[in-house]
């Protein structure tokens, strides 16, 4: 008994490094056992919610102390978020679950400026974090009465099969006019920082994926929520906020014929979305998750540059990995296509395995390459998709005022983010003394850009848009075609 106790104490202090273990994410060749210690920020005697708005954990990775700061992802669900499944007689059953006290967080590592994290705290800590340029996955070990977690690099997870997995979207790399045009555009520093955009997302799960997880709706819901939380984190550098509007699970049968040809399935899904799903609830983009093995080692497909189109703002993704993170990368990849991004050319793009790589890599990144950012900027400038311009209404998202959650909420003059924001006071979410604005195409260094400066170039027969000198936003020209 004494020997067992001593071993337990030693494990709590000194991380254990193992050679191989089977986790929920698969068979991991090299991992480290850690015991995250929660550091509470609540005042003594305060009532503790089930999931706090902010949390901090300490543990060791490679012998070095790590402090993980987490903040609840406040804008992750719309206030009218709904879940739909079907009864055996075909009736549609829709519920509106309370998701305010959810368990999905984003964050960073203390003293690592380039770090990021996307963590589910529902049952232990599960997700990923970037530390000193390396992406690590973390998940709880299924040991009784233990706080043990495994930390490991993605490349240390054994492949589920040897076949290369790739996106089915193709393009001609002889033409990279989009990138050339993007570099020729006159962009202010504020425009180069990407304007804020908002995407209301609908996720549909086909019958094959439902049965794959033992027809367990709760398991499906948890997996999808983790995916969307990961997508949100990956899109943050582009200043895109993702809000999940609905989850539709085909629990009894498929409502389209899910075929092995991914583009054909995407076309059928787009038709169904236009006829059925959009009539249930307004949203900007929908993705179908399926257990179908697409032909030609394809794991996803989406239309290029069709965000906001009622039929074509869709993607189809195979649930190709037990690792939530990897499927979330594929979903983000297909979303990127809808936002005008083509595949990374390994000879032209400064990223070995970024999100828009055509083939999944052993060292898969969660970053968008410079090429992807250029494509996205060009898409925003040339196509100006309208559905993602507007933030969800203050009554549309489950949130209490909190700085840096990417939504302008009741009582806020600006969404301040970090305390270092020169325009916005992080403590009050009010503009700092002397500041006129904090964001927008007509805001530069906290001041309105003078009247008459072009803030949005014309497209086709339209006219240029100009700053008016009294707002940080770029007003639409009233004479647009």
UniProtKB/Swiss-Prot annotation:
Tissues in which the protein is found: Expressed by the venom gland.
Pro-sequence residue ranges: 21-190, 393-408
GO BP term, pick one: proteolysis
Primary site of residence: secreted
Keywords: Cell adhesion impairing toxin, Disulfide bond, Hemostasis impairing toxin, Hydrolase, Metal-binding, Metalloprotease, Platelet aggregation inhibiting toxin, Protease, Secreted, Signal, Toxin, Zinc, Zymogen
Molecular function as annotated in GO: metal ion binding; metalloendopeptidase activity; toxin activity
Disulfide bonds: 308-387, 349-371, 351-354, 414-429, 416-424, 423-446, 437-443, 442-467, 455-474
Job description of the protein: Disintegrin elegantin-2a-f: inhibits platelet aggregation induced by ADP, thrombin, platelet-activating factor and collagen. Acts by inhibiting fibrinogen interaction with platelet receptors GPIIb/GPIIIa (ITGA2B/ITGB3).
Family label: Belongs to the venom metalloproteinase (M12B) family. P-II subfamily. P-IIa sub-subfamily.
The protein's name in its UniProt record: Zinc metalloproteinase/disintegrin
């Amino acid at each position: 008994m004494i020997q067992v106790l001593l071993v337990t104490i030693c494990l709590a202090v000194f991380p254990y490094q193992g050679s191989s273990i089977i986790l929920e994410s698969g068979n991991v060749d090299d991992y480290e056992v850690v015991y995250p210690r929660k550091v509470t920020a609540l005042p003594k005697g305060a009532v503790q919610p089930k999931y706090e708005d902010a949390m901090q954990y300490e543990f060791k990775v490679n012998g070095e102390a790590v402090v993980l700061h987490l903040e609840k992802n406040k804008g992750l669900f719309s206030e009218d978020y709904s879940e739909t499944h079907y009864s055996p007689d075909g009736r549609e059953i829709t519920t509106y679950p309370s998701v305010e006290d959810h368990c999905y967080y984003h964050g960073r590592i203390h003293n690592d400026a380039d770090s990021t994290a996307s963590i589910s705290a529902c049952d232990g800590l599960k997700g990923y974090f970037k530390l000193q340029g390396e992406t690590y996955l973390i998940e709880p070990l299924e040991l009784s009465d233990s706080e043990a977690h495994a930390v490991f690099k993605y490349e240390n997870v054994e492949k589920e099969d040897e076949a290369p997995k790739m996106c089915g979207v193709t393009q001609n790399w002889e033409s990279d006019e989009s990138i050339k045009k993007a570099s020729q555009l006159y962009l202010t520093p504020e425009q180069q920082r990407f304007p804020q955009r908002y995407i209301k997302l609908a996720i549909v799960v086909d019958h094959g994926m439902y049965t794959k997880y033992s027809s367990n709706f709760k398991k499906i819901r948890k997996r999808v929520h983790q995916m969307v939380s990961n997508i949100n984190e990956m899109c943050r550098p582009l200043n895109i906020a993702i809000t999940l509007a609905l989850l539709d699970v085909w629990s009894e049968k498929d409502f389209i014929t899910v075929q092995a040809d991914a583009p054909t399935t995407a076309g059928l899904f787009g038709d169904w979305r236009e006829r059925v799903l959009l009539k249930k609830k307004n949203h900007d983009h929908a993705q179908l998750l399926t257990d179908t093995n697409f032909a030609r080692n394809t794991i996803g497909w989406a239309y290029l540059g069709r965000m906001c189109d009622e039929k074509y703002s869709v993607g189809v993704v195979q649930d190709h990995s037990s690792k939530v993170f990897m499927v979330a990368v594929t979903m983000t990849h297909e979303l990127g296509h809808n936002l005008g991004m083509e595949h990374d050319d390994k000879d032209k793009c400064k990223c070995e395995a970024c999100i828009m790589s055509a083939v999944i890599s052993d060292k898969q990144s969660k970053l968008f390459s410079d090429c992807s950012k250029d494509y996205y900027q060009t898409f925003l400038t040339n196509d100006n998709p309208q559905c993602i311009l507007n933030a969800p209404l203050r009554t549309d998202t489950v949130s209490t005022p909190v700085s840096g959650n990417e939504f302008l909420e009741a009582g806020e003059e600006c969404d301040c983010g970090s305390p270092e924001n020169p325009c916005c006071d992080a403590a009050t979410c009010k503009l700092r003394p002397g500041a006129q604005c904090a964001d927008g195409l007509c805001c530069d260094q906290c001041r309105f850009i003078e009247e008459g400066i072009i803030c949005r170039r014309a497209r086709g027969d339209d006219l240029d848009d100009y700053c008016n000198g009294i707002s940080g936003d770029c007003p639409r020209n009233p004479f647009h075609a």
